Amino acid sequence: LNGAGKSTLLKVISGVFKPTEGHVDKHGKMVPLLELGAGFDPQYTGKENIYLYGAMLGYTKKFIDSKYDEIVEFSELQKFMDVPVKNYSSGMKSRLGFSIATVVEPKILILDEVLSVGDAKFRKKSEKKIMSMFDSGVTVLFVSHSLEQVQRLCNKAMILEKGKLIAY
């Protein structure tokens, strides 16, 4: 449901917002992908943004160097690495962000409607990647308006309405 507080909840969990009450305990490296293009500089190329986003997540240049080809290959944006991100479509930004966030091997991955844009083929590929991450013990929190997608991917789900939990 729109306006239910889903994105706000993910921002609290990832530390972007402070909770008005209580606290959030996290254990392990967390990688949030909260807004389309968040963490990207639109003036920089795709390649430059891979290193920028990696640095923002706390990874060294050497580490990103070792993962660069894997990021580019998964994103399927080889021909666009030297193009400024301001010229990317929303689907291309989603591909790049998702590819970076998943290749750095977080313990907790937070995705806010990232899989709602782009083509069906890449969504399916991304869902397969998420399933393999589950198998390796990664916790994935994601927002989706697609009940079918939630049923395919999740072993637990919750529904929010106006900031209240109405189903778990």
PLM segments and residue spans:
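A short, proline-enriched helix->beta-strand linker immediately N-terminal to the Walker B motif
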Residues: 102-111
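Helical segment within the ABC ATPase nucleotide-binding domain
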Residues: 123-136
